[in-house]
Regions:
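A short helix/loop element that forms part of the nucleotide-sugar donor recognition site in Leloir-type
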Residues: 8-25
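Short beta-strand->alpha-helix junction loop in the catalytic core
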Residues: 1-8
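Short alpha-helical segment that forms part of, or immediately flanks, the ligand-binding pocket
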Residues: 47, 106, 129-135, 149-150, ...
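Conserved donor-binding/catalytic core segment of Leloir-type glycosyltransferases
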Residues: 26-43, 190-192
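Short hydrophobic beta-strand element within catalytic cores of glycosyltransferases
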Residues: 139-142, 152, 159-160
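Acidic donor-binding loop of glycosyltransferase active sites
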Residues: 110-125, 138
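Nucleotide-activated donor-binding/catalytic signature segment of Leloir-type glycosyltransferases, i.e.
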Residues: 68-70, 78-101, 114
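Short acidic alpha-helix that forms the nucleotide-activated donor recognition element
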Residues: 101-112, 135, 153, 171
Length: 211
């Protein structure tokens, strides 16, 4: 569980003003926050989030800021995230806040408007960040995935976005290569993640409703 009183103290109006000022957010900018490990293999591929937010910016003509708050496991992930943002997000401004940044000792919960976590990884189980977001008073958009299904009520706390995968039985080769030692755990996670797709139409609708 979480300490809800703690989130009450770190997500008030004054904190919001301070955090947005430090990051240089304009009053009219809508801040969409992802918090967690910044790892496209072992957490969540950012492609769907970047594509969805960029489409929402184009459709609504509202200035959006996509904020990734967390830590990179290595330089490969950092480069991949930043290069993807440069190539995909032409209308959306993208910011990265590293975990432990002294300018944001409490994260960026107070400064955000929407929390969005599109996890597509089999190692993700319960998922604490959506609960932390709700404790901070944020509407959430998450994938309809594993433990997220149990913590976010679609249309009540926010929206759950469908994920698509090949039909049952088509993952036999992936499982065999992992259990036989031909592939390591990272290879297995990457292969399954690459076989998982987020419904971008549903994501676009959810974003535009909250924006």
């Amino acid at each position: 569980g979480i300490d809800t009183k703690h989130f009450d103290t770190i997500s008030g109006d004054q904190k919001r003003i301070e955090q947005r000022k430090i990051l240089g957010l304009k009053n009219e900018e809508i801040a969409i926050l992802f918090t967690g490990r910044l790892n496209y293999i072992a957490k969540a591929n950012p492609l769907s989030l970047m594509l969805g937010v960029e489409k929402a910016a184009k459709d609504t003509k509202i200035p959006l800021r996509l904020i990734f708050c967390g830590y990179f496991n290595d330089e490969i992930n950092e480069l991949a995230f930043k290069e993807s943002a440069e190539r995909i997000c032409n209308l959306t401004r993208v910011s990265f806040i590293r975990h432990g940044d002294q300018k944001y000792p409490d994260g960026f919960w107070a400064g955000a408007d929407i929390f969005c976590s599109l996890v597509d990884n089999v190692q993700e189980s319960f998922g604490l960040t959506p609960i932390e977001a709700m404790a901070s008073g944020l509407p959430v958009i998450v994938t309809d995935w594993d433990g997220y299904r149990d913590t976010v009520r679609d249309g009540v706390d926010g929206y759950t976005i469908p994920t698509l995968a090949p039909r049952k039985g088509l993952g036999t080769e992936l499982a065999y290569k992992y259990f036989s030692g031909q592939n390591n755990y990272g290879d297995y996670l990457a292969a399954v993640q690459q076989s998982t797709s987020v419904d971008l139409d549903a994501l676009s609708i959810a974003l535009k409703r909250l924006i």
